[in-house]
Amino acid sequence: MTDTAAVRGLDAQGYIAREGSLARVPAVFRPVVAAARERLTDLFGVRLHSAYLYGSIPRGTARVGRSDLDLLAALHDEPAEADHAGARALVEALDAEFPQIEGGGALLYGRARLLSDLERHDMGFFVACLCTPLLGHDLAASLPRYRPDTLLARETNGDLGLLLPRWRERVARAGDAGDVSDSEHTRRSLVRYMSRHLVRTAFTLVMPRWNGWSSDLRVMADVFAGYYPERAAQVRAAAALGYEPTGDAAVLTAYLDDLGPWLAREYTRVHGTKAARPEDATAS
């Protein structure tokens, strides 16, 4: 592997290298990971095909009391709503028990969907390159290797235009909350989520030209800035808020009225629109 390829998250052949490993999990987070492994097994039993960690914990960059626990579980069959509810309860229990983490989430998919043609360059890529095996047989063995090309860009983040109306609804609901402290907390969560999503979308917009991969928000923002200097300050500010969010409603307004719509238009112009998913037809 060349030094340049390593810095840009690629292997010697120019494919995106898998990030994260259990060996990189900081010692303080290992009890959380062990508990997650045990409880996922208890929750899903023989229905569980495999489970994965992703995010800062397996990358070794998690911050005590600030980072969340991110899990993905692949079931042999398609998950039902009760399964999603059970996974949410599992993460909430871990969050309450372990002060090392601040929140988290668990994605649930059926094995067949993760290996499908439709998901090959979205969730398939996510599992193969951004997830660290925790339990079961690693699905990456059944998935291709990935280059940072326009197909990957389109299928990972080419749906921002579809997401923006849903984000507006979430922000409106946060504004309608009766309890001021609850509203502040909700806005802070939305700022964190939207900031990260917009920075990642800005990065994958230019990813094929840069020819590399990173999951570091600041690196992503800096890479984007090299191609769109007129938007650099906005995306760098979003990267900072992705790590240290506030509950400022003005930030959300700027995302929804300016940066988000511009980025969605430019993304569609450059890469096209992500292939429709079945749930898109029924999503509100």
Regions from the PLM with identified roles:
Residues 47-55, 101:
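Short acidic amphipathic segments
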Residues 2-6, 139-284:
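Conserved nucleotidyltransferase catalytic core and NTase-mimicking acidic/glycine-rich helix/loop elements
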Residues 1-50, 231, 235, 283-284:
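Helical scaffold of the NTase/Pol beta-like nucleotidyltransferase catalytic core
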Residues 66, 122, 193, 197:
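Short, well-structured alpha-helical interface segments that form or flank functional binding sites
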Residues 3-28, 32, 88-189:
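Conserved NTP/Mg2+-binding pocket subregion across the NTase superfamily
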Residues 37, 91, 221:
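Generic structural marker for isolated residues within well-ordered, non-membrane alpha-helices
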Residues 53-89, 105-108:
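Catalytic metal-binding acidic patch
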